[in-house]
């Protein structure tokens, strides 16, 4: 029995190590800033603009925090929440700068990308921040788009976790004409126009042909997440789409929208079933969001689609590109669950037999065999990975037992 105790001890140690490694890489900017009330306004707007979610998602980040007094300078200008998001995204650097690194900048000056730059919101290099080590040990910051004026200086370090996250207090808000520029209000965000400009014209066309575009557009103000299949995926699916009834066509299109804004970080942290625009009464029309590392997949029980990237992120609207058309089980479940009808002792007329055996108008055809094969392959791969993990654990346990 001693070897069993050793094996159990090894398993506990492995679990604790895994838990420690997971927690050691995590950070929460909201909790970090909540420790100092001087940053309460800055902290509030990081959450309100969902920048906090993006900060927590990244493994290497620097936040240039400003106190309540400095924040009042931009709030008094009456900027919209979307403008404030752009301005604050200049304060999030996608590289690590601790106090030590600030004073060891090569040649005394450098420029680094902010989140305003890395997310594609900025044009050219207008989202870069200039950092300069001035004589006397002072460090100054300025937006490259603002004639590289050094408008703020380093005050103190708030929190540092080397090479993961650094929170530095700076004296003034960093801003620029481009960041302050008015952004489109939700009612100005025309979804079909956005889709057509972002390589989703085929999906935009079926939105309009079914009349579902109005439902999507009417939902934008309250929050909308759209999963847009690529043009090639829609093109491959069109023969089956054309065979659907009008009601099922509309339901399938609505199935690609969620009536809530969900950033990529929210999707990654919220595994489970989600409702869609097609959800109504007993018709669930939901699918499951699953995460595997950095990858996000959408599982419908009929097909699994992968999120390929973000096409548009302007709260309250976000649009993702996916690699497959989402097929709801409410439309295709008959194909998955139906069994052959019992043979009748009476012979049927030839034409009736043909009608009974023929595929239904809404049934998937050849491609659905491929979907089934894909699922079997995924299960096989999962079994293989599980087997490898078990083998590794057994090996470790055996090693501990031998000690």
Swiss-Prot record:
Keywords: Cell membrane, Glycoprotein, GPI-anchor, Lipoprotein, Membrane, Proteoglycan, Repeat, Signal. Residues 338-371 are annotated as: Disordered. One of its GO terms (cellular component) is plant-type vacuole. SUPFAM superfamilies: FAS1 domain. Expressed mainly in flowers and to a lesser extent in leaves and roots. Induction: Down-regulated by abscisic acid (ABA). It comes from the Eukaryota. It is found in: Cell membrane. Glycans are attached at residues 28, 130, 164, 248. Residues 1-26 form the signal peptide. A lipid is attached at residue 378 (GPI-anchor amidated alanine). It is a lipid-anchor; GPI-anchor. The keyword Cell division does not apply. Residues 379-403 form a propeptide. Its main location: membrane. The keyword Ligase does not apply. It holds the Pfam family Fasciclin. Residues 27-174, 187-326 form the FAS1 domain. Belongs to the fasciclin-like AGP family. May be a cell surface adhesion protein. PANTHER family: FASCICLIN-LIKE ARABINOGALACTAN PROTEIN, FASCICLIN-LIKE ARABINOGALACTAN PROTEIN 2. This is Fasciclin-like arabinogalactan protein 2. It comes from Arabidopsis thaliana. The gene is FLA2.
């Amino acid at each position: 029995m001693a070897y069993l105790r050793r094996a159990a001890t090894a398993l506990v140690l492995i679990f604790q190590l895994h838990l420690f490694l997971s927690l050691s890489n995590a950070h929460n900017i909201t909790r970090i800033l909540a420790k100092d009330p001087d940053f309460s306004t800055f902290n509030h707007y990081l959450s309100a603009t969902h920048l906090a979610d993006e900060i927590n998602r990244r493994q290497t980040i620097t936040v240039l925090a400003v106190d309540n007094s400095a924040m009042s300078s931009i709030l008094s200008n009456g900027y919209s929440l979307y403008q404030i998001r752009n301005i604050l995204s200049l304060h999030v650097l996608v590289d690590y700068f601790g106090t030590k690194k600030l004073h060891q900048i090569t040649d005394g000056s450098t420029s680094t990308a902010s989140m305003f730059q890395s997310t594609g919101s900025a044009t050219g290099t207008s989202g870069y921040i200039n950092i300069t080590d001035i004589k006397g040990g002072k460090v100054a910051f300025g937006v490259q788009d603002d004639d590289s004026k050094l408008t703020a200086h380093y005050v103190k370090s708030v929190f540092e976790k080397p090479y993961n996250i650094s929170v530095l207090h700076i004296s003034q808000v960093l801003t620029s004409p481009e960041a302050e520029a008015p952004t489109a209000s939700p009612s100005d965000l025309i979804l079909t126009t956005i889709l057509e400009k972002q390589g989703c014209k085929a999906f935009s066309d079926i939105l309009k042909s079914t009349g579902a575009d109005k439902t999507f557009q009417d939902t934008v103000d309250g929050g909308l997440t759209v999963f847009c299949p690529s043009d090639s995926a829609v093109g491959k699916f069109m023969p089956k789409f054309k065979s659907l009834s009008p009601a099922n066509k509309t339901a399938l299109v609505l199935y690609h929208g969620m009536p809530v804004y969900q950033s990529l970080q929210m999707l990654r942290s919220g595994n489970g079933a989600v409702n869609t625009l097609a959800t109504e009464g007993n018709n669930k029309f939901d699918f499951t969001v699953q995460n595997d590392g950095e990858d996000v997949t959408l599982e419908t029980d009929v097909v699994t689609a992968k999120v390929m990237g973000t096409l548009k992120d302007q709260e309250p609207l976000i649009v993702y590109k996916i690699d497959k058309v989402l097929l709801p089980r409410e439309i295709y479940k008959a194909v998955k669950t139906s069994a052959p009808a019992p043979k009748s002792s009476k012979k049927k007329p030839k034409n009736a037999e043909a009608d009974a055996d023929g595929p239904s108008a809404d049934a998937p055809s050849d491609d659905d065999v491929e979907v089934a094969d894909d699922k079997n392959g995924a299960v096989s791969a999962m079994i293989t990975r599980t087997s490898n993990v078990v083998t590794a654990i057994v090996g470790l346990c055996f090693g501990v037992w031998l000690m």
